[in-house]
A protein has these predicted regions:
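Catalytic cores of carbohydrate-active enzymes
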Residues: 2-98, 102-103, 154-186
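A structural signal for short secondary-structure junctions
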Residues: 55, 122-126, 145-146, 183-184
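Alpha-helical support elements that line or immediately flank enzyme active sites
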Residues: 57-69, 78, 130-139, 145, ...
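Generic hydrophobic alpha-helical scaffold/packing signal
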Residues: 78, 82, 113, 130-131, ...
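C-terminal substrate/ligand-recognition segments
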Residues: 104-141, 190-194
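Hydrophobic alpha-helical segments
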Residues: 132, 136-139, 151-162, 167, ...
C-alpha cells in the first residue's frame, strides 16, 4: 500500500486512505503507460518522443518501497542496469552502447560538463541499486551486494583515505574525479552497509 494511505489507516481515516490508494493506482498506471517500454524505463518522454537510453534514474523507481513497478518490471530494470551500467564504483550515467557515451571526466570545464551525465560513474546510485537488487533477488543477492562493496576498499584505504569521490571514469581503471569526501557517495555506501546489517 501507499505509505500515506497506511498512515491514514493507522489513524482510523479509512475514506482518506481509500482515496489515496485510488489516486496512487492512477499515478502508477500513468507512470507505467508513460515510461515502461516493455523492457525497462525510458529515460524521459517529450510529447510523442520516448528517449530509451539506458540510464541509472530508473533504478530509483525500482528501489522504492512503494514502487510503481511490479516485481517483473523491477527485475527487468535491475537486470538492464547490471548488464549495461554496473561497475565496481557504482552505476554509469549512461550505457556504453549509447552513441553519446563519454566515459572520462577530463578536459576543460565545457568538456567536463558535457561528459558529466554521459558516462562517468556516480557512486551515490549504489544504494538504490543495492536496495532494488535485494528486492528482486532477496537473500540470494546478498553475496553479490557484499562483493559490490569491495569495489570501494582500495579507494577508501589508499586513494581517497576513508572517503569517496563524487564520480569516477566509466571505464577501467575507474579513476576518481570531482569532489573528494563527497557526502552522497559516502552516504550511499553506508546505506548499503546498513541494509545488509
Amino acid at each position: 500500500r501507499l505509505f500515506t494511505a497506511t498512515i491514514q489507516r493507522c489513524l482510523g481515516k479509512e475514506q482518506i486512505a481509500d482515496l489515496m490508494e485510488y489516486q496512487a493506482e492512477i499515478t502508477k498506471d500513468s507512470f507505467i503507460k508513460t515510461f515502461w517500454n516493455g523492457y525497462y524505463l525510458d529515460d524521459y518522454v517529450d510529447g510523442d518522443y520516448h528517449n530509451a537510453e539506458v540510464r541509472p534514474n530508473q533504478i530509483i523507481a525500482a528501489s522504492l518501497p512503494y514502487s510503481p513497478l511490479d516485481r517483473r518490471q523491477c527485475k527487468a530494470v535491475v537486470d538492464i542496469c547490471t548488464k549495461e551500467l554496473y561497475t565496481p564504483k557504482g552505476l554509469r550515467t549512461i550505457s556504453p552502447k549509447s552513441g553519446g557515451y563519454r566515459p572520462e571526466y577530463i578536459g576543460g570545464q565545457l568538456e567536463r560538463d558535457r561528459n558529466f551525465h554521459n558516462g562517468p560513474v556516480w557512486p551515490w546510485t549504489i544504494a538504490a541499486y543495492a536496495i532494488a537488487y535485494l528486492k528482486v533477488y532477496q537473500h540470494s543477492g546478498e553475496s553479490f551486494i557484499r562483493r559490490l562493496l569491495t569495489g570501494y576498499e582500495a579507494e577508501m584505504s589508499e586513494l581517497c583515505i576513508g572517503t569517496l569521490n563524487e564520480l569516477y571514469d566509466g571505464n577501467p581503471p575507474f579513476k576518481g574525479h570531482g569532489g573528494m569526501s563527497y557526502a552522497p557517495s559516502v552516504a550511499s555506501v553506508i546505506e548499503v552497509c546498513n541494509t545488509l546489517a
